[in-house]
Amino acid sequence: MSTLAKIEALLFVAGEDGIRVRQLAELLSLPPTGIQQSLGKLAQKYEKDPDSSLALIETSGAYRLVTKPQFAEILKEYSKAPINQSLSRAALETLSIIAYKQPITRIEIDAIRGVNSSGALAKLQAFDLIKEDGKKEVLGRPNLYVTTDYFLDYMGINHLEELPVIDELEIQAQESQLFGERIEEDENQ
């Protein structure tokens, strides 16, 4: 497996939060200068490939994959599709997690779902069902996600407290099913 492929995979998983050279260097046990060179090669690869819709950008020291500007129109059209037909199971799972556990980071959502949620988050933001609401005060300062007023309107409620109450044990059981694990309840309960 090449260094470029490893970096590309980490950039994909990092999603819109991006990943810093220092983090890549630590994860891949490579010097930062080698990571910088590889990032340059990857950026050139995307730039030169007419069959790729991706580009590599750096913002505030974090690198992330984005779509090339010439794809903006088609992506805008895609995001205009009716919500009822366009929210995948992954997007609905992600929206439910945010609704009940907000504010929450993408990494925390990924931990619950067991898979990367960047695509689902982007779609939910495009539909204005969620928004970024500050940064978590931890290493890397990841974005915090919350639901929007439009989400409340869409759900037909005025406050989050009006969401159906879900038993915490039920949530844990559902989370465990996502991971393929089983929760064994205590016989005394």
From Swiss-Prot:
GO terms for cellular component: cytoplasm. Keywords: Cell cycle, Cell division, Chromosome partition, Cytoplasm. GO terms for biological process: cell division; chromosome separation; DNA replication. The keyword Cell cycle applies. It is found in: Cytoplasm. The keyword Cell division applies. It holds the Pfam family SMC_ScpB. Coiled coil: none annotated. It comes from the Bacteria. Participates in chromosomal partition during cell division. May act via the formation of a condensin-like complex containing Smc and ScpA that pull DNA away from mid-cell into both cell halves. Belongs to the ScpB family. Homodimer. Homodimerization may be required to stabilize the binding of ScpA to the Smc head domains. Component of a cohesin-like complex composed of ScpA, ScpB and the Smc homodimer, in which ScpA and ScpB bind to the head domain of Smc. The presence of the three proteins is required for the association of the complex with DNA. This is Segregation and condensation protein B. It comes from Streptococcus pneumoniae (strain P1031).
